């Protein structure tokens, strides 16, 4: 199983349009960027997209234009699903899997596309392309939001998607013996946002869960570029 971070940014991305903050200025001067958060999961020569961001076309072009065989939506916020329309006239529209409230909400915006829809209940594992996938509830009010656990062979990887630190205990109980944790870290440690973790929250929770590695995701342009454990666009991780 191979996981690629197609994007590690928040809804506005970095650089943010019209912003001259140090992070955005550095991004414009160096070409560094944080596209909107999305993952590419590869196994058995199949490709699963986790969240279809507004930057999907650019993300796929940057990574060899892979054929996408399935999509999983974590929740119904614009920056996590609206890019699904980019499949129009590009490839066969892939099937989408999501928790029922997420699938119903997001799919309704794509009535002009014909695609298969799979309702997946949280905490009920399902197998696809040799990967066992389990959706688990997180806390991202007011949106119904799920994280995603991937298991293959002896490898376990989790993506929290957008969440604050109040993840249900039932979900935390799943997040043991992780090889990699991809965790929400929206803002620096001195800022509190009720529906996201800040950088300190992410580091504290990662310390409690003790994954072999962790990377912070969904970073706003307030996050400095040089903090430890930041996921970077294009990072790849391979597991047996």
Could you describe each region identified by the protein language model?
Residues 1-50, 54-63, 119-170, 236-240:
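Core dinuclear metal-dependent hydrolase active-site scaffold
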Residues 10, 78, 103, 188, ...:
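Residue-level marker for beta-strand->alpha-helix junctions and adjacent short loops that shape enzyme
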Residues 13, 58, 81-82, 106, ...:
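Glycine/Thr-rich phosphate-binding loops of Rossmann-like dinucleotide-binding domains
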Residues 45-98, 177-180:
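Active-site metal-binding motif and surrounding structural segment of the metallo-beta-lactamase
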Residues 49-53, 69-77, 97-99, 157-163, ...:
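Active-site neighborhood of phospho(di)ester-bond hydrolases with catalytic His/Asp-centered motifs
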Residues 101-104, 122-123, 218-223:
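Short, polar loop motifs at secondary-structure junctions
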Residues 106-116, 225-230:
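Short, aromatic/basic amphipathic alpha-helical patches
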Residues 165-240:
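Cap/insert and terminal regions of metallo-dependent hydrolase folds
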């Amino acid at each position: 199983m191979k996981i690629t971070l197609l994007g590690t940014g928040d809804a506005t991305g970095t650089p943010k349009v019209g912003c001259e903050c140090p992070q955005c200025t550095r991004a414009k001067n160096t070409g560094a960027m944080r596209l909107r958060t999305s993952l590419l999961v590869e196994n058995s020569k199949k490709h699963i997209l986790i969240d279809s961001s507004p930057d999907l076309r650019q993300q796929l072009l940057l990574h060899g234009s892979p054929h996408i065989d399935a999509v999983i939506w974590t929740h119904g916020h614009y920056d996590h699903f609206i890019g699904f329309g980019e499949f129009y006239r590009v490839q066969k529209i892939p099937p989408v899997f999501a928790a029922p409230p997420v699938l119903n909400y997001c799919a309704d915006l794509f009535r002009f596309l014909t695609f298969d829809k799979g309702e997946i209940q949280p905490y009920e594992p399902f197998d696809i392309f040799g990967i066992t996938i389990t959706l688990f509830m997180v806390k991202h009010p007011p949106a119904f939001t799920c994280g995603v656990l991937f298991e293959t062979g002896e490898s376990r990887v989790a993506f929290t998607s957008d969440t604050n630190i109040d993840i249900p205990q039932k979900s935390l109980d799943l997040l043991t013996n992780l090889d990699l944790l991809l965790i929400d870290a929206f803002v620096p440690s001195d800022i509190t946002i009720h529906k996201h973790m800040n950088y300190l929250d992410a580091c504290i929770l990662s310390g409690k869960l003790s994954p072999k590695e962790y990377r912070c995701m969904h970073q706003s342009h307030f996050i400095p570029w040089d903090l430890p454990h930041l996921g970077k666009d294009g990072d790849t991780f391979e597991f047996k």
